Each structure stands twice: as structure tokens, then as C-alpha cells.
Design a protein with these regions (language model features):
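Multi-pass membrane catalytic core of lipid/isoprenoid biosynthesis enzymes
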Residues: 8-12, 54-113
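Short hydrophobic alpha-helical membrane-embedded segments
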Residues: 9-16, 71-73, 186-198
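Membrane-interface helix caps and helix-loop-helix hairpins in membrane proteins
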Residues: 56-60, 87-90, 114-121, 149-150, ...
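Helix-coil boundary and interhelical linker segments in multi-pass alpha-helical membrane proteins
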Residues: 21-36, 76-97, 138-158, 206-213
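C-terminal membrane-associated helical module and adjoining short loops/tails
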Residues: 124-239
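Topogenic membrane-insertion module of multi-pass membrane proteins
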Residues: 1-46, 202-206, 210-219, 223-239
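Short, amphipathic, aromatic/basic-enriched membrane-interface segments that mark the entry/exit
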Residues: 1-10, 61-67, 179-190
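"…together with the soluble PPM/PP2C metallo-phosphatase catalytic core" -> "…together
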Residues: 3-11, 18-31, 36, 90-121, ...
Length: 239
């Protein structure tokens, strides 16, 4: 069954393809399609790891390929989407290129992850998919009727500031729980609480008839804030 061993890498390659296509559509100004492709890349990123575990098809090549794909789909793509949004807003010069820092720091974060054996269950620093989906959902929500976000993005300082903050968070030492459930993990309880929160948020969003991208944006905002607060409380009680 040699073909089975190639399934995870095939899915990872689809992740990469989605990222490249997303960048192309971003250049064309089709940010909606770019966000859909980012979501598809995120699904592939989840499935390649899941299939590797189920099929026992781990490989060093797969590990490196996954990081290369992630840097395109969750590093370059969100950076270009932010850059494009600034250009469309009339921003020129150095400020318009500040979002590219996301791509650079995503590469650093992925390289650190590959050599750090302590991040097998949880992360140190913001994971690149979480960063990318926050960026993409912010733009999508602003373009589809969530007025508070649309008004926020009219301030041309928001995207550059967010880019720097997110980039620094990716290479920070802030512990962040992984969303992947693992048998016997002590962190499964907090993962369950988080999933329940997301489900309740989805129900509330459906009742209030808010655009679905709001769920994605609020979910990852809550994820980031929850981990920061947890780290602060842990630091306080360990002193």
C-alpha cells in the first residue's frame, strides 16, 4: 500500500495550491475568493495531519512540505490580502508594505516549530493558520455587512498595527493550546470548552442573522485572548 503513504503529502500539496491560487486572486482584487481558498487551505492543513496519524504515514519530507505550504497559505496570502486592502484604500509608500512582515515572521515561526520538540501537543506563539484566518475573516467581515469592522478598516493605521502585533505574537513564547484533540491529553477539557463556545457563538450568529465570517473572526479573537489571559494568570500564580 505504497500509495496510501502519499495521501498526507497529496493533501498538503492541495493546501499549497490553494495558497498560491489565493495569492493570484488577491492580485486580481478578488479578496472574497482568496479568503475561500484560505479556508480550503486550512481544511487541508487539518486533514493532512489527521490522515498522517490515521495511516501512520509520517515522514520528514511531509513535515517540511507542510511548513512550506503553510508559509504560502498562512504567511504570504494574508500578508498580500492586507497589502491589497491598503492599496485599495489609497495607502502608498512604506506603510502599504508593512503587512509583508506577516510572511517573514510566519516563516520564522514555522522554522522554530520544526526544530522545537516541546511543541508536539501545544504551541509557543500564535499558530500561522490562526493568524491567517483572523486576517482573512476581518477583511471578509468588513466587506460583507459587519459595519463595525468596515468602519475599523477605514482607519488606515489598523492593518499596519495589526500586522506588527500578529507577527510578534507568532514568534513570541506565549503558550497556546492546540485545537487538535489527543488521547489522554490534559488539555482536552479546555479544547472541549472552546468548541462549546464556538458552537454557541454559531447558534447566536444564526439567530441574529450575522454574516458567517463573524464566527471565524470572533473565534480566533477569543482563542488569542484566552491564551494570553491564561498565560498572564499562570505567570501571576507562579511568582
Amino acid at each position: 500500500m505504497k500509495i496510501v503513504r502519499h495521501i498526507p503529502n497529496t493533501i498538503t500539496s492541495m493546501n499549497l495550491l490553494c495558497g498560491v491560487l489565493g495569492v493570484i486572486f488577491t492580485f486580481r482584487g478578488a479578496l472574497d475568493i482568496a479568503f475561500y481558498l484560505m479556508l480550503a487551505a486550512a481544511v487541508c492543513d487539518f486533514l493532512d495531519g489527521l490522515s498522517a496519524r490515521l495511516l501512520h504515514a509520517y515522514s520528514n519530507v511531509g513535515k517540511e512540505l507542510d511548513s512550506l505550504a503553510d508559509n504560502i497559505s498562512f504567511g504570504l496570502l494574508p500578508a498580500m490580502m492586507f497589502h491589497r486592502r491598503l492599496i485599495e484604500g489609497g495607502v502608498t509608500g512604506f506603510v502599504a508594505y508593512i503587512p509583508l512582515i506577516i510572511c517573514v515572521f510566519a516563516a520564522i515561526r514555522l522554522a522554530k516549530f520544526n526544530v522545537d520538540e516541546n511543541q508536539s501537543e501545544n504551541f509557543l506563539g500564535l499558530a500561522t493558520p490562526a493568524c491567517a484566518l483572523w486576517c482573512g475573516s476581518l477583511i471578509y467581515a468588513a466587506d460583507h455587512g459587519v459595519m463595525s469592522f468596515a468602519m475599523m478598516l477605514h482607519d488606515t493605521q489598523i492593518i499596519p498595527i495589526a500586522s506588527v502585533v500578529l507577527a510578534l505574537m507568532m514568534v513570541s513564547r506565549i503558550p497556546m493550546f492546540s485545537l487538535k484533540f489527543k488521547k489522554g491529553s490534559a488539555y482536552n477539557r479546555i479544547r472541549i470548552y472552546f468548541v462549546v463556545m464556538v458552537v454557541l457563538l454559531a447558534v447566536a450568529t444564526a439567530i441574529l442573522k450575522i454574516n458567517w465570517s463573524y464566527i471565524v473572526l470572533v473565534t480566533f479573537t477569543a482563542y488569542i485572548m484566552l491564551n494570553i489571559l491564561t498565560a498572564l494568570f499562570s505567570l501571576r500564580f507562579t511568582k
